[in-house]
Amino acid sequence: MPHFTVVPVDGPRRGDYDNLEGLSWVDYGERAEREDSDGQGNHRENSPFLSPLDASRGNDYYDRNLALFEEELDIRPKVSSLLGKLVSYTNLTQGAKEHEEAESGEGGRRRAAKAPSMGTLMGVYLPCLQNIFGVILFLRLTWMVGTAGVLQALLIVLICCCCTLLTAISMSAIATNGVVPAGGSYFMISRSLGPEFGGAVGLCFYLGTTFAAAMYILGAIEILLTYIAPPAAIFYPSGTHDMSSATLNNMRVYGTIFLTFMTLVVFVGVKYVNKFASLFLACVIISILSIYVGGIKSAFDPPVFPVCMLGNRTLSRDQFDICAKTVVVDNETVATRLWTFFCHSPNLTADSCDPYFLLNNVTEIPGIPGAAAGVLQENLWSAYLEKGEVVEKHGLPSTDTLGLKESLSLYVVADIATSFTVLVGIFFPSVTGIMAGSNRSGDLRDAQKSIPVGTILAIVTTSLVYFSSVILFGACIEGVVLRDKYGDGVSRNLVVGTLAWPSPWVIVVGSFFSTCGAGLQSLTGAPRLLQAIAKDNIIPFLRVFGHGKANGEPTWALLLTALIAELGILIASLDMVAPILSMFFLMCYLFVNLACAVQTLLRTPNWRPRFKYYHWALSFLGMSLCLALMFVSSWYYALVAMVIAGMIYKYIEYQGAEKEWGDGIRGLSLSAARYALLRLEEGPPHTKNWRPQLLVLLKLDEDLHVKYPRLLTFASQLKAGKGLTIVGSVIQGSFLESYGEAQAAEQTIKNMMEIEKVKGFCQVVVASKVREGLAHLIQSCGLGGMRHNSVVLGWPYGWRQSEDPRAWKTFIDTVRCTTAAHLALLVPKNIAFYPSNHERYLEGHIDVWWIVHDGGMLMLLPFLLRQHKVWKKCRMRIFTVAQMDDNSIQMKKDLAIFLYHLRLEAEVEVVEMHNSDISAYTYERTLMMEQRSQMLRQMRLTKTERDREAQLVKDRHSALRLESLYSDEEDESVTGADKIQMTWTRDKYMAEPWDPSHAPDNFRELVHIKPDQSNVRRMHTAVKLNEVIVTRSHDARLVLLNMPGPPKNSEGDENYMEFLEVLTEGLERVLLVRGGGREVITIYS
């Protein structure tokens, strides 16, 4: 959280100005006791230097402390008014907000909007756990361990978990790069990669979530019909080959029934789904804990689940009870049911027995030997099977011979061909669900903190569970039981349930409810994702799915989701649906990593993630891993998924989604540049994509050398913005005569740019007047979308001493041009004191004085400077001014929130400026400014006299300011010898001999001038702000502050220059910043 303090600023010190006729000192101590105080010891607006009319204007009379900025308040508001709007910020989308307001309007009263209140645990960690743990853990992980072996199973888990962990790191960077409104992962991807990629990936994520609902429903049906209620099956096999088809048909019928019921539940109300979410999560946690307890118990008291073996083949034990060929009953050997199945007759002399049955012995082995039995070593290695192959145990004696084909149904056989790649595709859905936290971003109290911490902790937790489960299963369960997918060899028990304590039913019931809950969650989330895509209107034919019920529920999207999920139900095989699901999720994760890598490599100014533990190499590794997993698990599914995504991309591009969200080689570069420039012509960039495109206006000396090369140094230190840099200059004269001179100047500037490491372009124009040439550069530099949006302009040093008013007229006219063109303006003052690229500031501060808000340039520039090695170690401080009517405490809170969302690390200080009286010093300085202005216009001074006059004024100002700012205590008795007198006073004038050749007839009127009221107020603003700034920032490495706009009336231009001089007096390095009238920094992702 940013550090902030409140600094009260006292009024100016008392001085002795008795030589000013008609002025008297205002005693603040006495006036505070009078009726014209505000009751808190603060002086009212009354002043001997302002007319009562101005003081009585009330709200129309703007704060005297900020009078310099009063002409532009409509476009550059006070900071306090901007910060107040942050309190009403909401994460809700527009439609949801309107719906909430409509609901809260019942009875004519609006309820207060409920603020997001979820923390990391409830908002991210537990939902991620619930979405990651799913049907694969309970139904397929044991089979995967038995088939791939412990070592390869650990490798599969490691690859999949690394993929999601790397994706979570990339996602955390994107999610913390600004406020993520309700919309989650789709919002992040689409706003990072643009509408084409966003739409394609969004639809892939939607299809993945929809097929996830189908997978969870199929898992629930498998648990129901296999372990809970097998008699509930509708279809039964009529022959040996009808077993699989009967199972699939049962899955289709019951799956459709379950899907219809769940869709109705979601349609009736999501609140019911959310209410049961905690119950479903509890089922998952209890089931997992029972597995661990059972594993520990098996070490000293293994559960009894015997497995019947014929030779080394595993028998399906759901059709017989006694594991023997014959039994002795009443001293008579009788055939068992097992004999009857293999010999098709209870007669012990039957000659139609299966040869393998006759030649091999029937034995019984423990299905759960326990952790102390040493089966881990046997289960280390893989045992991949082809479809229809019998599950065998290595090490048991067996006489190999061909058995009868009819007997195959009596063994435990593989229902699908298995390999490492197949298992990767089946297991990957068990690590998906990492987006659950970001999908709830609108409900989180602090999404930028909760999403990274909660998601990564959930992935670490689930990964540890998977790793430990693989080792636990391999150490406790017999290999043939592990390879028995449906538990046929252990009397049709769920294999993982055989290990659980106290009963297999804990796992059976828990896994059933957890899969049902996960299915409901998927059916709830997928329609909302489709609705978000439809509302963005990037895919026109999906527009209808953006509408819903009156309460905003996505009815049409839910209907489409149910129809697509039905396609997954009709596939009817969990092992076939899982790879499809993997493809869509891997596609989504691939583009999340791509988005992070692209943003990191481009280093756009808006890329400021609060989560710091990311790197483009990690994102690239995650992207490569996703792509590899897609082709490893199922190359043809991967191609289909990529074709679908590509078709969606081209369709959105073809439709022209106008959304704002982001030698031979030379010929190729030219073609690419032309294509890029044409694409950039669409309009101004989105705030997130804004970066400073600089036009640096240089002044050349008589030898065509750059007069202030540090302007180029400063521009190079802003190169972290990765924007365009154009360096321009003007040669005064005729183009026909000065063309060669312009070419030479251009080459000189290019050489200097190379020395200062400025990457950009140079343009020198020839014009009859410098100000016209500068106006041409401002208007015409750049090409297409690659145009400058910011102008760097040098300060006109020595304007006071110059006998030519064009010295400062050119400067002010250029300021007006940039304002008219809606360009930002940067004016580095005292540029000679700016650091070179070889210097390093090992400590210090960059101080930002945020007086009025004009687009956020003041915030963005220090961030860009601190990316450069010169300024890297400097810390950022932001000062803002609170007036008497501002709530400074609330401003502190709002500013802290604002900076947090901007992802800027800075100390914050709120400076309280009381509306004190305008001091005699201010009045005198204004008077002298106006007198000097008139004198220089009226008197025909020689150059020597004018230089002396300007130097005297400058010396007097500097001495007076130093005395005022750095005196520790007030001096009540200032002697006459210590007084600083005006250059032109009544006494001085009367004492001098009259010479009509040196003075105008109306000079005697100058000493009777009363300064303009608005000039007094503006001078008061400059003096007060300068006192505060020098007091707080005199030791800062750089001070940035708002540059007041020039007066609308050009007659006050010279006074405007004086105001700027007073405002920046006593500061070593100042950067005056004037925004271009648009936002350049945003809190959004």
UniProtKB/Swiss-Prot annotation:
It catalyses: K(+)(in) + chloride(in) = K(+)(out) + chloride(out). Glycans are attached at residues 312, 331, 347. Residues 1-119, 173-196, 441-450, 532-554, 599-612, 652-1085 are cytoplasmic. Residues 665-681 are annotated as: Scissor helix. N-glycosylated. Phosphorylated, phosphorylation may regulate transporter activity. The modification Phosphothreonine is found at residue 983. Keywords: ATP-binding, Cell membrane, Chloride, Disulfide bond, Glycoprotein, Ion transport, Membrane, Metal-binding, Nucleotide-binding, Phosphoprotein, Potassium, Potassium transport, Symport, Transmembrane, Transmembrane helix, Transport. GO terms for cellular component: membrane; plasma membrane; synapse. One of its GO terms (molecular function) is protein kinase binding. It is found in: Cell membrane. Residues 142-149, 226-248, 298-419, 474-504 are extracellular. PANTHER family: SOLUTE CARRIER FAMILY 12 MEMBER 4, SOLUTE CARRIER FAMILY 12, CATION COTRANSPORTERS. Homodimer; adopts a domain-swap conformation at the scissor helices connecting the transmembrane domain and C-terminal domain. Heterodimer with other K-Cl cotransporters. NCBIfam families: 2a30. This is Solute carrier family 12 member 4. It comes from Rattus norvegicus (Rat).
